[in-house]
Amino acid sequence: MAKQEYKQLPKRAEIHSATEQFKDTIKTSLGLDLFKGLGLTIKEFFSPSVTIHYPMEQLPLSPRYRAVHNLQRLLDSGSERCIGCGLCEKICTSNCIRIITHKGEDNRKKIDSYTINLGRCIYCGLCAEVCPELAIVMGNRFENASTQRSQYGSKSEFLTSEQDAKDCSHAEFLGFGFVSPNYNERMQATPLDYVQEPSKEESKKETPTSPEANKGDENV
């Protein structure tokens, strides 16, 4: 075990007279420590301000910011992406998602109710990560204050409007839970494909040999 060595500081001399106390006060007040603190204060006083005037000004949020959820629609037809599989409800650690479904005439699940209790949600993003249809994603709307509890979690609050999906004003989500670009080619490729592809540096180093050089090697 390492031995701890402590450095002993010199003990401050005791002050007995008023003259010594006055000298100590002047030394402490007009010392370098005072001017260092004043210099730092003056430097920060003239530095550019980093304060924003909220709510008139807002900082840009990251695409992977996890705030109030969004329920997506298909951009071509405007239909809901959710298929009612219930994976988001099962994986939710806060037990705040509730889905009620029924079987339709085409033997497919139809969603009757989809609610998220935002008072219990911890915005972990597991529901968006496990969704196979990319139907639920984490949005960037963090201003969700309300005086009524009933406004926290209704489906109409999360669902993207059908008009936004059909007029192409709603783009695909590129944040938390979104698949990486060119994912189809990457999934079909095997590890050997990556090995067989030569890098640019290796292709530059490899120079083709001339036929005359090959003939000379054969004669030898």
Swiss-Prot record:
GO cellular component: plasma membrane
Source taxon at top rank: Bacteria
Compartments, record wording: Cell inner membrane
Pfam families: Fer4_7 (PF12838)
Metal-binding in keyword set: yes
Name of protein: NADH-quinone oxidoreductase subunit I
GO molecular function: 4 iron, 4 sulfur cluster binding; iron ion binding; NADH:ubiquinone reductase (non-electrogenic) activity; quinone binding
Cofactor(s) annotated in UniProt: [4Fe-4S] cluster
Gene that produces this protein: nuoI
Source organism per UniProt: Helicobacter acinonychis (strain Sheeba)
